[in-house]
Amino acid sequence: MFDIKFDSKSETVQLVYPSGKTEVIAKDSPTIPIKSPDNTKAAYISPLEWEVYGNLYLVDLENGEQEVLVAPDGSYIPKNVIWQDNENILVIIGFGDGTVCIGGNIFRVNIKTKEKTQITSYDSIVQITDLYLEDDMLHYKGIRYTDDILNESVAYESVISLDSLLTF
């Protein structure tokens, strides 16, 4: 079984072979990899930096293979990711340019079929920037703009039952 780690000193994602040997698999501003609940897969975004279009990568920790799970779609890029279960991830996808769209909307992606299902449908007034699972609920937060020129904002939070995601 392979492992994966983030080296904060070099800011790289490294694949760890069963022998202990390491190989850098991402060096362009990657996120810290997150493992699936059963620890057989990992996901990370690279690069994730201002106005740079990154990919969401899936790493199979059983064989060490890596693939792009979500690539930029026009100007829309993956910005944050968590695991829903062993077969699905939840990813924030949003506009990649400018200063207004700091977040985006939540999508569920099946890791086997790469089928993408939109969970939230906010316009640019609401920008989701973070998400987490707790007590069978999907919690998410970000900002809601309060003026017409999208300059002033307040904190925004909401929650969705994981059971309701089955209907999407």
Predicted regions and their residues:
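Blade-terminus and WD-like Trp-Asp/Gly-His loop motifs, strongest in beta-propeller folds
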Residues: P33-A42, N80-N88, D130-D136
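Eukaryotic scaffold repeat domains enriched in small/polar residues
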Residues: F2, P78-K79, Q84, L133, ...
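A generic tandem-repeat structural signature
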Residues: L61, E67-L69, K79-V81, N86-I111
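Short glycine/acidic-enriched loop and turn motifs that connect beta-strands
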Residues: P47-E51, F95-V100, R144-I149
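Multi-bladed beta-propeller domains
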Residues: Q14-P30, E62-P78, K112-V126, L162-F168
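Terminal domain-start segments
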Residues: M1-V59, S153
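Residue position within the beta-strands of beta-propeller blades
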Residues: D3, Y44-I45, L90-I92, H139-G142
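Acidic, small-residue rich beta-repeat scaffolds with periodic aromatic anchors
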Residues: C101-F168
